[in-house]
Amino acid sequence: MTQNLHPLLQRAQTNGIHFEMKGAVAVVRLSRPVKRNALSDGLVEALRDVFQNLPEEAKAAVIHGEGDHFCAGLDLSELKERDAGQGVYHSRSWHVALDAVQLGRVPVVAALHGAVVGGGLELASACHIRVADDSTFYALPEGTRGIFVGGGGSVRIPKLIGAARMTDMMLTGRVYNAADGERIGLAQYHVPTGTALNKALEDRKSTRLNSSHRRLSRMPSSA
C-alpha cells in the first residue's frame, strides 16, 4: 500500500521494506527473502524512514520477515574495510534506525521465526515485545567473525539476558533455540511454528501495549 503515504515511506518500499496498515497497526515486513532479510545499508535506512514517519493513525507496529527467516543480520556482501570515521558513521546509521524503532511514538512487536542472528537480534532487541515461533534461533556470530556489535545491541541485549550470556554468545558462537530464548529473556512469547505474526497482530495486545508506551518512550535511550 503506497497511496497517501509519506514520500519516505514510499521510498522505503524500494529498499527491502513492505509497509501496510491493518487497522491501527503498521505492519512492516522485511522483504529480502533471498538474502534471508539481511540488513543492507538501504534496508537500515528504510527502517529509519518508516519509524520516523509512521502515519498518524498508527497506534502500534509489527515487524516481521518474509520467507523462512526474520533476519540473518548484516548483509555480508556489503562488508568492507572502513577507516575510523567511516566506521563511526556506519555504526551511527544503525543507532539512528534502531532508536527510531525503540523510542518512536508507538509500541513495536517483533514476530520472529527462523534466523534472528547478529543485526537481526539487534533489531529484535529494539522492539518492545518479541513473539518467537518454534522455528526461531538466536545467535551473535560477530565475535567469531571479528565484527563489532555496533548498532546498540551491546547495550540492549545484555539488558534482556545479562552481560555474561551475551559474552558467551559472542565468544563461543552459542545458538539458542526458541524455547531457551524465551527462558533466558530473548522473547516474551513462544508460539507454534507459523503463528508468531498472528499472535503479534492481536488487537487486544496492541491496544494494551499502547496505553503505557508513552511512558516507555520517555526513558533514556539504551543505545
Task: Give the positions of each predicted feature.
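Hydrophobic alpha-helical membrane-association signature
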Residues: 43-46, 90-93, 123, 196
